[in-house]
Amino acid sequence: TTKAEVVKHLEDCINNSGHDLVKDQREIWGYTNTTVNSNNSGYRYQYPIDHDLHWVGNSCVETVFANKHNLTSNWTYTWFSNTWSMFCSPSNDNRDIKQSYPFSFGWGAGPVSPKMVDEWKDWAARQSYTDGYTEDPRLTRSMRPYPAYDPNNKGNVLLDRKLDKGEPDYSVSYRYYEQTGYFQKKYINVGAWDDESNSFKNSWALVENPGVTAQTSAQLVQTTDLIHIRFADVLLMHSELTETADGINRVRERSHLAPVSYSLENLKNERRWELAFESVRWFDLLRWAGPSLESAGKILNDQTGFDLINEGIVTPMVRYDYAARLKQTQGYWPIPQDEIDIAGGTLEQNPGWDASAAFVDWNNFK
């Protein structure tokens, strides 16, 4: 496939597919569904109320390609539920439902680097805006900043990263690591209060669709799309390949950012902020870095050197040398050992993935 052919396909999608940008990017994500605030209990998520947000639903006009999910999962077939949001949601260890409403729980793998937040703020401060805006609204669209309450000393705040008054607080886990005061919230489990049962449900979908399933575990009832390609990504891909600013500025306009001319640096920034936490950043870094991978390694290493919370204690982050590790692996994943065994000696493991690379524990993380 040639570059010209790819551009032609992108232009066909832009002009003829019927896909488009939704009015407000926040309305793509499940946290803006109205079910969370449709109860008589007084439980409210203030952020979408303050910003007048209304979820556009799954399979929206901006979604080009996505995994679909539903309420038919059980403990034999778990994959009908959105497990990615389970991985990226806060721990349940010390969660207070009223304090953290409407967010449900997960396995705690969605913390955001404070260095990334600082870089985003710094970039946003140097932009020009329209419609009276003075900051990039995608920052609070994309993450849930919170005051981190101490699990061992009620009322004590360990770190306060709150950026929007409409976001709820959170009592951090007494045993989880790398809790930073920020969670991404594009893929986060969102629950809702159910008036009928007078209880909190681990997914808003259980309240909106009563009786569809008897399952109640957060692991089995997450129904939001896992989006792989959005129309915004298509516009940015087209800008990059044609070295034109039309796609960039169409994406920026939605977030009340003034137009810019095309440059690779402008393109890189738009992709970073518009598509934050959507699983495209890693491969963007690798392809822009080229064979040396030096720029990717530097960017990864820059995301260290801040305080975080491990086991309920504020501590400096381990300064792991991501650049050195990237150089060892060249960005490749390991070949599964089963496949190497089946191949009977015809396959060699990728560089950087021998036995010495195996993770031992956090205390021996170098």
Question: What are these model-predicted stretches?
Answer:
Residues 126-253:
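C-terminal substrate/ligand-recognition segments
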Residues 4, 8, 137, 246-249, ...:
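Generic alpha-helical secondary structure signal
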Residues 3-6, 58, 132, 225-227, ...:
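Active-site-proximal structural scaffolding
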Residues 11-19, 237-244, 252-256, 269-273:
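Sec-exported extracytoplasmic/periplasmic mature domains
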Residues 2, 6-10, 239-246, 289:
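Generic hydrophobic/packing signal
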Residues 30-99, 194, 201-228, 249-252, ...:
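Long, intrinsically disordered, low-complexity segments
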Residues 1-170:
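An aromatic- and glycine-enriched ligand-binding surface/loop that stacks and positions planar moieties
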Residues 4, 8, 12-15, 118, ...:
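Polar/charged alpha-helical tracts
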